[in-house]
Regions:
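Active-site-adjacent bridging/hinge elements
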Residues: 17-22, 74-86, 107-118, 155-163
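Active-site recognition of the HExxH zinc-binding catalytic motif
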Residues: 95-116, 135-139
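Short, glycine/acidic-rich hinge or "gate" loops at secondary-structure transitions
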Residues: 3-14, 59-63, 119-126, 150-161
């Protein structure tokens, strides 16, 4: 950070750090993923992606609250309303890499919930096996927003652009996951 801001290490102050609590990765690599999503319909990309892997989320998408409005909770979450298949997502999407990854993440929870909301199961079994299992599924899908190969498949960028940003995307994603692992260990200990 000292090099980035042109100050001596001894002169670094808290405001020089992007996230003092180390919950988000600092922007260290030369890729602006946000520019690739600025003119995209994240709702459609999310629906198309899950359809491409055989998961129909159109009913969940229609029942969800996805766009910002005044006084709305700014967080994002997925909730299984009744254990009978009424699964909804709450987001505040605007076209950005952050919200693309969030949509993939939250609908990852939703498809996981869709899988355990089988009508033949007793209600006591209609829930996540553990927080780690539902988070793992959600994080696997979330990662796609940062993967150039996925972005090509979804028509967001072309192969040439994918090759140009591949290393920076890999390093960005790796750093995000390392910091997430650190944060999770603090929260769950």
């Amino acid at each position: 950070f000292a090099k980035r801001y042109g100050v001596a290490e001894s002169d670094l102050m808290p405001w020089h750090f992007q996230d003092r609590f180390l919950q988000e990765a600092p922007n260290l690599y030369p890729v602006d993923l946000g520019k690739y999503y600025r003119d995209k319909n994240l709702e459609q990309l999310t629906t198309d992606f899950y359809a491409s892997i055989g998961l129909d989320i159109t009913k969940m998408m229609a029942a969800s609250d996805l766009y910002p409005r005044d006084k709305k909770n700014q967080h994002a979450f997925c909730t299984d309303i009744d254990g009978e298949g009424d699964v909804r997502v709450m987001c505040n999407i605007t076209p950005s890499d952050y919200w693309m990854s969030t949509m993939l993440h939250e609908f990852g929870h939703a498809v996981y919930a869709m899988g355990h909301d089988a009508s033949g199961l007793p209600h006591s079994l209609r829930g996540a096996a553990h927080t780690f299992t539902t988070e793992a599924v959600a994080m696997i899908y979330e990662r796609n927003a940062y993967k150039p190969a996925w972005m090509v498949k979804m028509g967001i960028i072309d192969e040439k652009e994918a090759a140009a940003i591949s290393d920076a995307c890999f390093n960005t994603l790796r750093l995000k996951q390392l910091l997430c692992a650190r944060c999770v260990q603090v929260v769950y200990r």
